[in-house]
A protein has these predicted regions:
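Sec/Tat signal peptide C-region and signal peptidase I cleavage site
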Residues: 18-24
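Hydrophobic alpha-helical segments of small multi-pass membrane proteins
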Residues: 98-103, 122
Length: 123
């Protein structure tokens, strides 16, 4: 009886950890989406570059937190691409290359993540 209880406790703990991890990735992706939308659509143009810079740093942290998932890489690519647009000029070229690389890295993990957003973003 004790063995069954131990097994059940272990299984329930693993399920809980999986749920927590699933919720963590969902929360992180939701955060990136919401912040991107606020910066892109509601922030005064003169402030966008700095805000996208900060969000790009946060996206990188989230990618490092979930290295086996494509979704954070896709959002990092989208954020870097939009940051490049806000930055403009020659300084944006490096950001564009970096964004493309993130999207290609995401494609290697899961080409269908976020309903194929990789291909929409790559053009």
């Amino acid at each position: 009886m004790l063995k069954i209880h131990t097994i059940m406790t272990t299984v329930m703990s693993l399920l809980l950890v999986g749920t927590v991890n699933a919720n963590a990735i969902d929360d992180d992706i939701s955060y990136l989406q919401k912040e991107w939308a606020i910066i892109n659509y509601e922030t005064v143009e003169d402030n966008r570059e700095d805000k996208f810079y900060v969000l790009a740093k946060k996206a990188k942290e989230i990618v490092e937190k979930h290295p086996d998932r494509a979704e954070p890489l896709i959002w990092e690519g989208i954020i870097l691409s939009t940051y490049a647009g806000a930055k403009g000029g020659l300084g944006a070229l490096g950001l564009i290359k970096e964004a493309r690389n993130r999207l290609l890295d995401a494609e290697k993990i899961n080409p269908n993540a976020l309903s194929g957003s990789i291909y929409t973003s790559l053009g």
